[in-house]
């Protein structure tokens, strides 16, 4: 379905460089897919600590990402615009990062103005089907906007009505 991404440089989206050596304290990202004989694709990503346990900072970031995921899942229901779920996940992230001293100010303002996108440069998910990013532009052009213009703001521009749900963020 796509070349496996296996890297200690998860801060670079779709990083296929494999020349690094994993060392103590690193986080290891694997983003892998599979394709069935029928042609349908799957996509799975996970980040694990090289030392098998998170450092305290890594644990704090993991807990923020997990809260983003859980709050997003709770918010999903028929009729809710996917952008609202994205905004919710971004606000959860901003509040968590404020607790770590990495962001400040009002979370709603930060999300509205795009300050969160420094840590959340991607959308919330993507369509999957016969391609791992099936009909990539469908959600942006045809689904869920009701005539509203598509945002060009980093992170927001790739919102789609889609599964899987993949909240997360990047910290370099």
Language model features with spans:
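Active-site neighborhoods and metal-handling regions in enzymes and metal-associated proteins
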Residues: 1-172
């Amino acid at each position: 379905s796509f070349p496996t991404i296996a890297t200690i440089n998860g801060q670079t989206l779709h990083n296929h460089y494999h020349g690094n050596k994993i060392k103590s304290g690193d986080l290891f990202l694997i983003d892998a897919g599979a394709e069935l004989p029928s042609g349908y694709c799957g996509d799975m990503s996970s980040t694990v600590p090289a030392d098998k346990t998170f450092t305290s900072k890594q644990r704090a970031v993991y807990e923020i990402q997990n809260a983003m995921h859980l709050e997003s899942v709770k918010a999903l229901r028929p009729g809710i615009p996917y952008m609202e779920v994205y905004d919710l996940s971004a606000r959860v992230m901003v509040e968590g990062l404020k607790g770590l001293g990495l962001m400040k100010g009002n979370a709603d303002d930060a999300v509205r103005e795009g300050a969160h996108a420094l840590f959340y440069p991607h959308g919330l998910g993507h369509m999957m089907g016969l391609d791992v990013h099936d009909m990539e532009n469908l959600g942006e052009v045809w689904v869920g906007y009701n005539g509203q213009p598509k945002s060009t703001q980093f992170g927001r521009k790739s919102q789609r009505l889609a599964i899987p749900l993949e909240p997360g963020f990047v910290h370099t």
